């Protein structure tokens, strides 16, 4: 489970779509399941507790990138549930570390 903190324009198709899928799973854990169940104690889940507004904004950034690339988005999040902080300031890996991780994957991400 990973929600990157890198600007979505730098993600390859594979990672952009995967993050979108993971973000929806995370959103459901935190909203529908009230932070309970399978991945509720995962570090990626825990860093978004109290930051649904920031998670919503990340989703919207992904959707804007979808639009730029001509992808069709059909899974909006309920904005009414986007509460809490609009800023994510907890990182599992720093931005620099995330770029290294993506470079090591030898994918088509555009990280410099």
Task: Give the residues covered by each predicted segment.
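Expand to "…catalyze enediolate/carbanion chemistry for C-C bond making/breaking, isomerization
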Residues: 1-112
């Amino acid at each position: 489970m990973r929600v990157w903190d890198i600007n979505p324009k730098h993600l390859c198709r594979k990672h952009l779509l995967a993050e979108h899928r993971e973000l929806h799973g995370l959103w459901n854990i935190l909203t529908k399941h009230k932070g309970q169940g399978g991945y509720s104690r995962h570090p990626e889940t825990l860093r978004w507790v109290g930051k649904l507004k920031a998670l919503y904004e990340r989703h919207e950034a992904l959707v804007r990138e979808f639009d730029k690339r001509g992808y069709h988005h059909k899974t909006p999040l309920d904005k009414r549930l986007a509460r809490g902080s609009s800023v994510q300031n907890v990182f599992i890996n720093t931005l620099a570390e995330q770029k290294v991780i993506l470079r090591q994957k030898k994918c088509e991400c555009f990280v410099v």
